[in-house]
From Swiss-Prot:
Its main location: cytoplasm. Residues 592-773 form the Lon proteolytic domain. Induction: By heat shock. GO terms for cellular component: cytoplasm. Residues 6-207 form the Lon N-terminal domain. This is Lon protease. ATP binds at residues 356-363. HAMAP family: lon_bact (MF_01973).
Length: 784
């Protein structure tokens, strides 16, 4: 070859020797550039390239000074392009060369000069050295299965030709297990004798290391096998011994508990009988597991364990007032209940049942009662329960059987006299698995619950010291169950009570949860009132607490997002900036007096509402139509009001001989909301009279009351909520049934001060105060 300059490629982890064929993966940019610049030799139509080892393995882009000058001239046999701009080449090392004038540009390029081997002077000695090296290599190959058999065959083939000593030395050198630096030194060595001597020394070292490692592995393997066998046998022996000891120890513990616990006579006899069976059983049998579980359950109940509670009604009252605002009647009845317990120290009174809409504090009241009595609190949620086994338990014969939740709660609180909440007692149902309401009869009957028998235990357990308190959203309970309980109705909070609860409880609670500093966020009273009126519609305060939480979060976000904002004041003017548009609206008084339109008062589970009732007359057949999603009772009230009006038409100076020629349509707005009840009778009657006499109704007058066909006004419920709605809506005068006057003592003073409350006993008194003028003896006839 005449050309003395070729592209140069640096290798990371390989030293090639002349005569060796090797594959190389090419991925670095300079190496790929060098590969692309190779040209076909004119002499033999072949591409050549220079390859050399770089001095530092981890160098990604070595400079020309970081390359060894002793390199290999290689012939490129094959180039295969791979994905990701890489390639695989197969090269044959042709000769050892000395590099000079290395150029470091886009790729390496260098001049080269072939380095010849020194002449072998003593061929006989060389033959002996090579034979020795080959024998060592064969021995090494037998110990190390990684050496390819083809390499051994190639070496044996070359040794038969006495002139190929150099090739044999190079092949042996390329397969030595040694450092890259040692291999590079072998490449640089020009003396064949010195090279073969180094190869023999390295092979000898490799064989010794391999034999030592192999012997060590054998010794370690035998030791591990022996250790594992000994460990397995030892652990098996320990497990067997432990099982035997544990069984004995566990049986001894069960026997000790039977003797030490204050079991009833019946329970002790049952426990001893079951224990005798267990001791005689095979401890690995399934039946022994059932018996063991039964005994563990029986002995884990708090037999004879009672909290030493001392009831102090003054302290209990303080706790109730601390945790709950308002609810005075409810608190008073609870204190009376506790007073009886304090004096008698025995529970024989009725079971309390707190009935009210969600969120009014029924569950938290029971917690406060437990704290006031100094007893533990247990809760049994009955919502959705339809299997009586939840109360009485499953019989032992069933797979996975367990005691009922009543005893389960006693086991949990570890006392036989807790305060137990029976939550959502109205939401039980029954199916083919039984009626849980009937199962509760025994639990709640003071004459029976001292002998309560759970199906799982099959022995009596005394529940007479448990204080049972139930809660419900509806008074619709099975009669037998209802008969065993004293119902306390919680009507819900009025606006003023919600305001005080928010100021004194909810806002401080949310500020504490969100780590609000003093004076960092202030929420005005009018903002809280707007929250109650326009963002919540409930009888309790759960939604109100959620809105206060949202308000606090948004205000805190503003403070943290803007360092210039140190505090935020929230009032009714900027409330919508935080919570968006108002969600609800309460009724407001009409802007002017209207004919055929009257303001009634309604009571819903979320409080009182103004109820507008309007009517029109048109040609027809003398019928009365009602719309607004009215219930049957309210429709009947409309019919009664119309009949009452027609019977009294002559008193108003009206002729009724043409009533069959027109229809009256009564509508109650908010048609999507169901409405029912008899208390709109007065308002319906007044609306019809106003329509037929064409006399307006005072816009600031609202009314409530059921009427009879004879015109008498009957009492209604929900007076407190209705009066609050009237006061809130701008009403000045409210007409109420005379029989409801006794309920005014429960109305907050501020509401009574804002309203003129007039009691009425008949519809004539209603018309006197409701209509702008009385329609008497006017000689009117109704014309369309």
């Amino acid at each position: 070859m005449n050309k003395k300059s070729l592209p140069l490629m640096a290798l990371r982890d390989m030293v090639l020797f002349p005569g060796v064929i090797a594959p190389i993966f090419v991925g670095r940019k300079k190496s790929l550039q060098a590969l692309s610049r190779t040209t076909i030799s004119e002499e033999n139509n072949t591409k050549y390239i220079l390859v050399t080892l770089q001095k530092k393995f981890d160098q990604e882009n070595p400079s020309k000074h970081e390359l060894y000058n002793t390199a290999i001239l290689a012939k490129i046999i094959q180039i295969v392009k791979l994905p990701n701009n890489t390639a695989k080449i197969l090269i044959e090392a042709v000769a050892r060369v000395k590099l000079s004038d290395i150029k470091d540009e886009e790729s390496f390029e260098a001049n080269y000069e072939i380095i010849p081997d020194e002449e072998i002077l003593d061929m006989h000695n060389m033959r002996s050295l090579v034979d020795n090296a080959v024998q060592l290599f064969n021995k090494y190959a037998m110990n190390d299965k990684k050496v390819n058999t083809e390499i051994i065959e190639t070496i044996n083939k070359e040794i038969s030709n006495k002139t190929n000593f150099i090739n044999i030395i190079n092949i042996l050198a390329s397969h030595l297990i040694t450092s890259l630096e040692t291999k590079q030194q072998l490449l640089e060595e020009t003396s064949p004798v010195k090279r073969i001597t180094t190869v023999i020394t390295t092979l000898t070292s490799n064989i010794v290391n391999s034999e030592t490692e192999h012997a060590l592995q054998q010794r370690v393997r035998k030791q591990i096998e022996k250790t594992q066998r000994d460990y397995y046998l030892h652990e098996q022996m320990k497990a067997i011994q432990k099982e035997l000891d544990e069984d004995k120890s566990e049986l001894a513990d069960i026997e000790k508990k039977i003797k030490s616990l204050k079991l009833s006579k019946e329970a002790k006899e049952k426990a001893e009988s079951e224990f005798k069976k267990l001791r005689a059983m095979n401890q690995m049998s399934a039946e022994s597991g059932v018996t063991r579980n039964y005994l563990e359950t029986l002995l884990s109940l708090p037999w004879g364990k009672y909290d030493n509670s001392k009831i102090d009604i003054n302290q209990a009252e303080k706790i109730l007032n601390r945790d709950h605002f308002g609810l005075e009647k409810v608190k008073e009845r609870i204190i009376e209940y506790l007073a009886v317990l304090q004096r008698s120290n025995k529970i024989r009174g009725p079971i309390l049942c707190l009935i009210g809409p969600p969120g009014v504090g029924k569950t938290s009241l029971v917690k406060s009662i437990a704290e006031g009595m100094g007893r533990k609190y247990a809760k049994f949620s009955l919502g959705g329960v339809r299997d009586e086994a939840e109360i009485r338990g499953h019989r032992k014969t069933y797979l996975g059987s367990m005691p009922g939740k009543i005893l389960g709660q006693l086991k949990k609180v570890k006392t036989s006299n807790p305060v137990m909440l029976l939550d959502e007692i109205d939401k039980m149902s029954s199916d083919f698995r039984g009626d849980p309401a009937s199962a509760l009869l025994e639990v709640l009957d003071p004459e029976q619950n001292s002998h309560f028998v759970d199906h799982y235990l099959e022995v009596e357990y005394d529940l007479s010291n448990v204080v049972f308190i139930a809660t419900a959203n509806s008074h619709d309970l099975p009669r037998a169950l209802s008969d065993r309980m004293e119902k306390i109705y919680i009507s819900g909070y009025v606006e003023e009570e919600k305001l005080q609860i928010a100021k004194n409880y909810l806002v401080p609670k949310q500020f504490k949860v969100h780590k609000i500093k003093k004076d960092e966020i202030t929420i005005s009273e009018d903002a809280i009132l707007d929250l109650i009126r326009y963002y919540t519609k409930e009888s309790g305060v759960r939604a109100l607490e959620r809105e206060i939480c949202a308000l606090t979060r948004k205000a805190l976000k503003q403070i943290l997002a803007d360092n210039t904002v140190k505090n935020i004041s929230i009032d009714s003017n900027n409330l919508e900036e935080f919570l968006g548009a108002k969600k609800y609206n309460f009724g407001l008084v009409e802007k002017e007096d209207q004919i055929g339109s009257t303001t009634g008062l309604a009571y819903t589970e979320v409080g009182g509402e103004l109820l507008t009732i309007e009517a029109l007359a048109f040609s027809g057949k003398g019928e009365i139509k009602t719309t607004g999603k009215l219930g049957d009772v309210m429709k009947e009230s409309a019919m009664a009001a119309y009949s009452c009006f027609r019977s009294r038409a002559p008193n108003f100076g009206l002729k009724y001989d043409n009533y069959k020629d027109f229809d009256i349509h009564i509508h109650v707005p908010a048609g999507a909301i169901p409405k029912d009840g008899p208390s709109a009778g007065c308002a319906l009657f007044t609306t019809i009279v106003s329509l037929m006499t064409k006399i307006p109704v005072h816009r600031t007058v609202a009314m409530t009351g059921e009427i009879t066909l004879r015109g008498n006004v009957l009492p209604i419920g929900g007076l407190k909520e209705k009066l609050l709605a009237a006061s809130r809506g701008g009403i000045k005068t409210v007409l109420i049934p005379e029989e409801n006057v006794k309920d005014l003592k429960d109305i907050p003073p501020n509401i009574k001060e804002n309203l003129e409350i007039i009691s009425v006993s008949n519809i004539d008194q209603v018309l006197k105060h409701a209509l702008v003028e009385m329609p008497i003896n006017k000689g009117l006839s109704y014309d369309l």
